[in-house]
Amino acid sequence: LDGYTTANWTVFVNLIARECCLQGLGLEAIDANAATLKSGKEIDAIIDPLLIWDTKIDPTLLYGKVYKGGYQGLMDEARTEAFKKAVPASRQAGKISVVYGYGSLIPELRELYDVKVFFDLTPMKSMLRIRRGEYSNLGKERPGIINRTIRRCYYCDFECAVRNRHELWENNVPDWYVLDNDPQNLQLM
């Protein structure tokens, strides 16, 4: 499961878990971001130099440069290699493994999965989720100050998501598309 920034796959994974219980199947949910991304401090060291932090130059802390390294540039190489081995090792008869995370369908990882699903939502819904504290920037454990979280999204998180989504559609990768504007009314296409 991959998706646009702030995609919420929790309900979807829980529904799959419920169906697995009814069918007598096991379920393992694997957080690809926790398994592959660099630490928040390491990602900050990559992104912060692209943002202007001097309030004398930029009083509103609005300006910066777009990060162009994609999700791949935010991933820890050793952790990603371990993840590439762990996912196939998790396959067992009578068990379903669900991998979720931003960038989990990048070319380097997509062959690990049998079914590829992309969660999409409108930018407005994404911003509302950020403002409600429902999103932490890539590599972060908790939401930060709203304006800084949004700023980081504009220059990094949104950019990674848009480029990833473009590549996925260009190559006809997703098997399923989920409209995630309303987690209580997911639309699977």
Regions found by a protein language model. Give the residues of each.
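N-terminal active-site beta-alpha-beta segment that forms phosphate/nucleotide-binding
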Residues: 1-41
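Structural motif
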Residues: 1-6, 100-103, 181-182
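NTP-dependent small-molecule kinase module
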Residues: 11-24, 124, 131-136, 155-189
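Glycine-rich loops and low-complexity Gly/Arg-rich segments
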Residues: 24-27, 53-56, 122-126, 140-145
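ATP-dependent small-molecule kinase phosphotransfer cores
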Residues: 25-96
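Conserved beta-strand scaffold positions in the cores of enzyme catalytic domains, especially
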Residues: 27-31, 114-118, 175-178
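ATP-dependent NMP and nucleoside kinases share a basic, alpha-helical "lid"
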Residues: 83-139
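Conserved segment of the helicase C-terminal RecA-like domain
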Residues: 142-155
